[in-house]
Amino acid sequence: MHKKYFIGTSILIAVFVVIFDQVTKYIIATTMKIGDSFEVIPHFLNITSHRNNGAAWGILSGKMTFFFIITIIILIALVYFFIKDAQYNLFMQVAISLLFAGALGNFIDRILTGEVVDFIDTNIFGYDFPIFNIADSSLTIGVILIIIALLKDTSNKKEKEVK
């Protein structure tokens, strides 16, 4: 018999990501001034202390009330989807846990300081990507995993229809 929910795994992932996110942000905020930067991998990765009071790329800068409301709605929706749509599906539960942790990590920053600490500064194929953090990475990986899970589910349904 398959497990319906992988609660322990899901909580462990979410707690690890939130703690890792918050610890790294704390280290950056307490040891570097905004704008300070150092190179980790030449021409590819820097650690740069940055603050963002908006979303990705500074979109909706200063709209904290909006972010509070939308984040609470998203967190509740993720719990709902975890319970309703991710039954027996460890892959989907991991994806939702990563999304939850990423949203919560940035939400904690917004509540405590009114802005998000960003510090991962990459240059990918000559494009200076916007500075981000562990929570943002968790959100991105979670979205990618959800897309993979949905594509796989769609593919499996088509295979069953053919048979």
Swiss-Prot record:
Pfam family, one: Peptidase_A8
GO MF, one example: aspartic-type endopeptidase activity
Native species: Staphylococcus aureus (strain USA300)
GO CC field: plasma membrane
One Gene Ontology biological process: proteolysis
Pathway: Protein modification; lipoprotein biosynthesis (signal peptide cleavage)
Biotechnological applications listed in the UniProt record: LspA is an ideal target for anti-infective agents as it is required for the survival of MRSA under physiologically relevant conditions in human blood.
Main location: membrane
Annotated catalytic residues: 118, 136
Extracellular side: 26-62, 113-133
Description of activity control: Inhibited by the antibiotics globomycin and myxovirescin. They act by blocking the catalytic dyad.
Keyword Secreted appears in the UniProt entry: no
Full protein name: Lipoprotein signal peptidase
Cytoplasmic side: 1-6, 84-89, 152-163
